[in-house]
UniProtKB/Swiss-Prot annotation:
InterPro entries referenced in this protein's UniProt entry, alphabetically: DiHydbiliverdin_OxRdtase, Ferredoxin-dep_bilin_Rdtase
The organism of origin for this protein: Prochlorococcus marinus subsp. pastoris (strain CCMP1986 / NIES-2087 / MED4)
Lineage summary: Bacteria, Bacillati, Cyanobacteriota, Cyanophyceae, Synechococcales
PANTHER family for this protein: PHYTOCHROMOBILIN:FERREDOXIN OXIDOREDUCTASE, CHLOROPLASTIC (PTHR34557:SF1)
A Gene Ontology biological process term: phytochromobilin biosynthetic process
E.C. numbers: 1.3.7.2
Record-given protein name: 15,16-dihydrobiliverdin:ferredoxin oxidoreductase
Enzyme's top EC category: oxidoreductase
Catalysed transformations (reactions): 15,16-dihydrobiliverdin + oxidized 2[4Fe-4S]-[ferredoxin] = biliverdin IXalpha + reduced 2[4Fe-4S]-[ferredoxin] + 2 H(+)
Sequence intervals crossing the membrane: none
Family indicated by similarity: Belongs to the HY2 family.
Length: 236
């Protein structure tokens, strides 16, 4: 599941003359003890994005997970793209969160880089779930227009692909239109991306999920050396 989403990201990175990077075997594909859960990962980079990662978790009919995060290079104050999608097969429930995660909460910054999410939300009302805003910290690395969906099989089949593609395409377009920094210098950008990784490594809700399936040792290594590498290694 979600192969089309992965391929869409990959194609767009290739259009930017980006490339897929080699990653260690332990992260490229990892199975839990009884192989009921399989996690696969990819990393890409381009001139515009120093790291664009994808994670897919295959739990068969019970659970399917897709996550992608794009880090602009340190010369760009552009937000970090973040998308989490979970499909719970037993209950037939979809949970998805999409956002252009801002490096700062300055009003003019948010308006310039993140406000176009509102246009996408207006097209897909199912992704405008105000009841779930307690699941994130609005004062940290989330925009006022974060898109949240708690949906069903119909939303999975009918809406998800279209809204994900709009979300990614819009992000790429905005980045092309705004090449000049207005709010942050290089050192501030780097420090904010480091803080983002530290914050995310501590707060990531997938931590418990991964520990349940793959154990604490592997999960800690995965979080610090694949997902959020700036948490403990500021130069990576």
């Amino acid at each position: 599941m979600f192969e089309s989403l992965k391929n869409f990201v990959k194609t767009n990175i290739e259009d930017l003359d980006g490339k897929e990077l080699e990653i260690s075997k332990e992260f490229k594909e990892h199975h839990n003890k009884d192989s009921k859960y399989i996690i696969k990962n990819w990393i890409f980079e381009s001139q515009q994005y120093r790291k664009w990662r994808i994670t897919k978790l295959d739990g068969g009919d019970k659970l399917q997970v897709f996550n992608t995060v794009a880090y602009p290079n340190f010369k760009s104050e552009f937000p970090i793209l973040g998308a989490d999608i979970l499909w719970f097969g037993t209950s037939q429930k979809l949970l998805a969160i999409f956002d252009y995660q801002p490096l700062i909460q300055e009003k003019k910054y948010l308006q310039k880089y993140c406000s176009s999410l509102d246009f996408i939300k207006n097209q897909y009302s199912v992704f405008d779930n105000h009841k779930m805003k307690n699941i994130y910290d609005s004062k940290k690395y989330f925009s006022p227009w974060v898109m949240i969906c708690r949906g069903n099989k119909l939303n999975l089949d009918r809406d998800l692909n279209n809204i994900f593609c709009s979300f990614v395409s819009n992000y790429l377009t905005i980045n092309k239109l705004h090449q000049n920094n207005q709010f942050l210098d290089l050192e501030q950008i780097k420090n904010n991306q480091i803080d983002y990784d530290k914050y995310s490594a501590e707060k990531d809700p997938a931590d418990k999920l991964f520990k349940t399936f793959f154990g604490e040792t592997w999960t800690e290594n995965f979080i610090n050396n694949f997902l959020f590498t700036l948490n403990h290694n500021p130069l990576k």
